[in-house]
UniProtKB/Swiss-Prot annotation:
Keyword Magnesium: yes
Keyword Mitochondrion: no
Name used for this protein in its record: Deoxyuridine 5'-triphosphate nucleotidohydrolase
Domain of life: Bacteria
Binding site for substrate: R75, S76, G77, N88, T92, V93, D94, K102
InterPro entries the UniProt entry points to: dUTPase (IPR008181), dUTPase-like (IPR029054), dUTPase-like_sf (IPR036157), dUTPase_trimeric (IPR033704)
């Protein structure tokens, strides 16, 4: 089968976005076609000393359709180059939440202070469908190959 670019075209859904900061209208947008994450920016100056954390406002609130969740992910470049990441990655924004999306950032670099200014990209927002589970109480669970073997049970190398 020949590669067809439309084959990988993602499905889309509408997400309502409200800008909360008139000085920094923060509309969500994707940096490149095909990106999974839309950039979230800061609307304030933020200085993070080594091992310091802050809850950073983004200036946006969203309304997701039922059956969707927004996940706040770190930006790989910030983590790799500055040691800054999202503390609770991925952060969960439920469909019913209408408040401002805020990002808990932490500077894990032991020596350097990280500085952000309004408009700087600080995280990515990924929209995903989800399945709501029906949790059923059970006295026993069916067997599996893994059973109760947990952390480290598969080894460290193949």
């Amino acid at each position: 089968m020949a590669f067809d670019e439309t084959y990988n075209e993602p499905e889309s859904t509408e997400v309502l976005v409200k800008s909360l900061d008139p000085e920094h209208p923060a509309l969500l947008r994707y940096a490149h076609a095909g990106d999974a994450g839309a950039d979230l920016i800061t609307t304030v100056d933020v200085t993070l000393k080594p091992f310091e954390r802050a809850l950073v406002p983004t200036g946006v609130a969203i309304a997701l359709p039922a059956g969707y969740v927004a996940l706040v992910h770190p930006r790989s470049g910030l983590a790799a180059k500055q040691g800054v990441t999202v503390l609770n990655a991925p952060g969960t924004v439920d469909a019913g939440y209408r408040g401002e999306i805020k990002v808990p950032l932490i500077n894990l670099d032991p020596k350097h202070t990280a500085v952000f200014h309004p408009g700087d990209r600080i995280a990515q927002l990924v929209i995903q469908r989800y399945v709501e589970a029906r949790f059923i109480p059970a006295e026993t669970l069916p067997g599996s190959d893994r059973a109760e073997r947990g952390f480290g049970s598969t080894g460290v190398a193949s």
